[in-house]
């Protein structure tokens, strides 16, 4: 009987020494139910411990990096309106069929393009077939005035002139009309470019390929 009592007591002591369910502290990308489950300054976002965008921590940076097109990694981050955006100094390599995202830009004065086009310090009509390229593809202005060939997934293609940079380094200010920095794989086209490709600009972003014309 004494042995049974000792066994029960030993089992009881073992059980109370275990941490309660959910009390384990998770590090980057570990499971969580609330911020108390996460280590240090990490917070619980969609069931995983991650950096707090409002605090601006980068504890989890590089822990499980999302793959970037062409191996071009972010050079930093820019926080605007409480949301963190990656910045880039580079873009994927240009090929005879470079994958990209086509977005829509208003190149006229007062439009969402912000200031005048960088290539010629002028505003442009949206009836022109013109584009802005991500910082890496803009390449310090070396493609200014040059024509590129854009092909949509519907098979249609159009030639357009490079007149501006879609800034991947800066944003969220008056110069950029409050827009966040561009991703590193953007071809920002005028209304005329979208129309020539038979695309609805209200879609916002579509997959394309492009090359030098």
Curated annotation (Swiss-Prot):
The modification 4-hydroxyproline is found at residues 65, 67. Residues 1-24 form the signal peptide. It is found in: Secreted. The keyword Signal applies. One of its GO terms (cellular component) is extracellular region. InterPro entries: Kiwellin-like, RlpA-like_sf. Pfam families: KWL1. Keywords: Allergen, Disulfide bond, Hydroxylation, Secreted, Signal. Residues 91-121 are annotated as: Disordered. The keyword Iron does not apply. Residues 93-107 have a biased composition (Polar residues). Undergoes proteolytic cleavage by actinidin to produce kissper and KiTH. Three forms of KiTH are produced by cleavage at different sites. Its main location: secreted. Disulfide bonds join 28-60, 32-44, 38-49, 72-90, 80-172, 119-144, 166-182. Belongs to the kiwellin family. Kissper is an anion-selective pore-forming peptide. This is Kiwellin.
